[in-house]
Amino acid sequence: MRTFEGSFCGKDLKLAIVVSRFNSFITDELLKGCLDGLSRHDVDSENIDVYYVPGAFEIPLVAKKLAKSKKYNAIIALGAVIRGSTPHFEYVSAEVSKGIANVSLEQEVPVIFGVLTCDTVDQAIERAGTKAGNKGFDAALSALEMANLMKNISES
């Protein structure tokens, strides 16, 4: 039996990060955590491109364009959708998650879901660097692992 898994080595990987500007008090912290995770695992800052979009709903389109370019080993999507008093939360959350998954499957490039979908601002703050760690950092590690796993599969 052969076993395959990705490593967390970021050397020579080219990564894109798509960040929503909406709820920037959260997404800025997710981006900081993500960049910290990448730098701690030897990703050269010259190999990281950051793209800003207005809101989470716009993330899948930009991720698709980047994935189609075949320039990146992985793409990290960062955003924060926080429930309000209207059904808007459900629409945006559902479409963003479906859109990101579809891009990854269609383009065969890992697109990591680092979009927080929280009921409250406090939950989002907790996941952006306080009690629950930083989900941006976690997304960075997922991107490294998946990028390396995809390389291993291609080489086997």
UniProtKB/Swiss-Prot annotation:
EC number: 2.5.1.78
Superkingdom, natural source: Bacteria
Binding site for (2S)-2-hydroxy-3-oxobutyl phosphate: 85-86, 127
Reaction(s) the record says it catalyses: (2S)-2-hydroxy-3-oxobutyl phosphate + 5-amino-6-(D-ribitylamino)uracil = 6,7-dimethyl-8-(1-D-ribityl)lumazine + phosphate + 2 H2O + H(+)
Cross-referenced Gene3D superfamilies: Lumazine/riboflavin synthase
Keywords: Riboflavin biosynthesis, Transferase
Keyword check for Transferase: yes
Record: residues binding 5-amino-6-(D-ribitylamino)uracil: 22, 56-58, 80-82, 113
InterPro entries according to UniProt: LS, LS/RS, LS/RS_sf
Class of this enzyme: transferase
Pathways involved: Cofactor biosynthesis; riboflavin biosynthesis; riboflavin from 2-hydroxy-3-oxobutyl phosphate and 5-amino-6-(D-ribitylamino)uracil: step 1/2
GO terms classed as biological process: riboflavin biosynthetic process
One Gene Ontology CC term in the entry: riboflavin synthase complex
Keyword Transferase among UniProt keywords: yes
Position of the signal peptide: none
SUPFAM superfamilies: Lumazine synthase (SSF52121)
Active site: 88 (proton donor)
Molecular-function GO terms, alphabetical: 6,7-dimethyl-8-ribityllumazine synthase activity
PANTHER family noted in UniProt: 6,7-DIMETHYL-8-RIBITYLLUMAZINE SYNTHASE, 6,7-DIMETHYL-8-RIBITYLLUMAZINE SYNTHASE DMRL SYNTHASE LUMAZINE SYNTHASE
Family of the protein in this entry: Belongs to the DMRL synthase family.
Function summary: Catalyzes the formation of 6,7-dimethyl-8-ribityllumazine by condensation of 5-amino-6-(D-ribitylamino)uracil with 3,4-dihydroxy-2-butanone 4-phosphate. This is the penultimate step in the biosynthesis of riboflavin.
Name of this protein: 6,7-dimethyl-8-ribityllumazine synthase
Originating organism: Caldicellulosiruptor saccharolyticus (strain ATCC 43494 / DSM 8903 / Tp8T 6331)
